[in-house]
Amino acid sequence: MNAPDKFTSLLSLTREPFPASHKCLIPGSRPDLNVPVRDVLLTNGETVSLYDTSGPYTDAKVEIDVRRGLPGVRGAWITERNDTESYEGRSHQALDEGLKHAHDHDAQRLAELRAGASALQRTPRRAKAGANVTQMHYARRGIVTPEMEYVALRENGKREWMAEYLANEERAKRVAGNPMGASIPRIITPEFVRDEVARGRAIIPANINHPEVEPMAIGRNFKVKINANIGNSAVTSSIEEEVEKLVWAIRWGADNVMDLSTGKNIHTTRDWIVRNSPVPIGTVPIYQALEKVGGVAEDLTWEIFRDTLIEQAEQGIDYFTIHAGVRLPFIHLTADRMTGIVSRGGSIMAKWCIAHHKESFLYERFEDICDIMKAYDVSFSLGDGLRPGSGADANDEAQFAELRTLGELTQIAWKHDVQTMIEGPGHVPMHMIQANMDEQLKHCHEAPFYTLGPLTIDIAPGYDHISSAIGAAMIGWAGTAMLCYVTPKEHLGLPDRDDVKQGIIAYKIAAHAADVAKGHPGARSRDDALSKARFEFRWQDQFNLGLDPDTAREFHDETLPKDSSKVAHFCSMCGPKFCSMKITQEVREYAAKKGVAEAEAMAEGMAQKSREFMAGGGEIYIPIQPAS
């Protein structure tokens, strides 16, 4: 099967619209600014509108050809600013796919993949001489861009349906969240988005060479976002599988995706992914740079790394993880750790520093990196190369020395108006999580925090998506802006599509729990809508309002598969006689019939049962009468 056919076959499994759902567009101030949301039609006639990350893939009305990529929704916005220029760009080299593969005998296969990707190529753009094209640069000059308006509309969504669930003032006050120092307005305006980006408290990752991206914001005063990692390795996965993983990930709610490919055809894989992604794409450029020198860390040079940054910026990568905080003076601090340096990027740079006994070129050349970033509006994700790899190493001096350095680098990036977020751990026991957030806010000036979990315990291989989602929910409530998912395969192997889904669902739970705890406007309304459906035994609505309708329906149908069970006033947990919600409904119906309050109905019912008990002789144990 050739590549395009395989793409089509794989994506056909991933493009199914969600049940009882359709896309709806929220119009902006201009004809080409429309924000998609997912409307769920309930069986009682209500409609619930949900934030949607799936792009056009779940829209049955849209035809998608992955060989041509998605439409460039931001193309006109970028062009009309008149501060960028098209140019020829660097030529693709065999070395871009990795040194080993530049010398292998698979040239024909590589040529086929490149030919298949040729229709995806866009002529790259960059800032005109002396210009700065970052969203932070515009924001600091008081300009509200279409991207900022898009974010505001997206964060607000359609709130009309929430009115019923927000009307009870007593309940709203009782369950109101604690924002933990965040400043979340009731309504997100474009001006608020601009101000948050200008302050550096939020970023909108949106490379000018990724016009297909649907703008989103990462910041503690916005919804908590999640990131999913995909990417091949030297031993497994193909380009087709990685593109399908991308579409699968955003279907289930990934707000961002990182391509962490370290195997063959790295450049070509990225072409396919970026051109077909409606969400921001991030990378760790040092991985590809290492491939270019055959995997020998000490052979890395600034020139090779710089060329890799430009290569990826031209392709449209929206944010780079750069481990510029791994400095020579810090490496000895990891010597007594239980698990040493566990970050791949961190270990690469540590090895380079030790081999040359020199300061990291990422640190020394940081301002040169800023010049590249602001020419394409690539955001920094300042990597935590010295993050703890076990609970025993949490919050040590190596971790916090690097964090303080990342704060210093943030100030340098902001001097160039480059958008910046800070990466965090890792492995942190529950009682040490708040200290991580406190230190980050103290030293990194409220730049968005982006954490990998953290895992709260180390004894759950195969279940690390659960052990880490606990920490993710806690640190998300404390102020982390984006959570990097962990799959069941963490520490064990490369995740497949089912692992990706499980990791995303676990992290959607964590992110939503954090939003509810923070009191994010409207966050709890979806919970209330599902709770109402549950109480009213609207099973289909329960399934369809959940994070994973497929699994909910499957679990229900394992014991009650008949269609009649979808309207039954009980489930297999309690059965028809002991369903608490059914009993409560009967009490309410009895009260309504008698024209009394629920409490009175309960009292009357108890009195009636008392009379029946006494009339029966007042005996606790009644002899069984033989059947006549």
UniProtKB/Swiss-Prot annotation:
Keywords per UniProt: 4Fe-4S, Iron, Iron-sulfur, Lyase, Metal-binding, S-adenosyl-L-methionine, Thiamine biosynthesis, Zinc
Gene Ontology biological process terms in this record: thiamine biosynthetic process; thiamine diphosphate biosynthetic process
UniProt-listed InterPro entries: ThiC, ThiC-associated_dom, ThiC/Bza_core_dom, ThiC/BzaA/B
One Pfam family named in its UniProt record: ThiC-associated
Binding site for substrate: 229, 258, 287, 323, 343-345, 384-387, 423, 450
Reaction catalysis annotation: 5-amino-1-(5-phospho-beta-D-ribosyl)imidazole + S-adenosyl-L-methionine = 4-amino-2-methyl-5-(phosphooxymethyl)pyrimidine + CO + 5'-deoxyadenosine + formate + L-methionine + 3 H(+)
The EC number(s) this enzyme carries: 4.1.99.17
Cofactor: binding details: Binds 1 [4Fe-4S] cluster per subunit. The cluster is coordinated with 3 cysteines and an exchangeable S-adenosyl-L-methionine.
Binding-site residues, Zn(2+): 427, 491
Cofactors named for this entry: [4Fe-4S] cluster
A cellular component term, taken from the record's GO annotations: cytosol
Any one GO molecular-function label of the UniProt entry: zinc ion binding
Highest taxon of the lineage: Bacteria
Pathway stated in the Swiss-Prot or TrEMBL entry: Cofactor biosynthesis; thiamine diphosphate biosynthesis
Binding locations of [4Fe-4S] cluster: 571, 574, 579
Cross-referenced NCBIfam families: PRK09284.1, PRK13352.1, thiC
Free-text function comment from the UniProt entry: Catalyzes the synthesis of the hydroxymethylpyrimidine phosphate (HMP-P) moiety of thiamine from aminoimidazole ribotide (AIR) in a radical S-adenosyl-L-methionine (SAM)-dependent reaction.
Subunit: Homodimer.
Stated name of the protein: Phosphomethylpyrimidine synthase
Native source species: Variovorax paradoxus (strain S110)
Designated gene of the protein: thiC
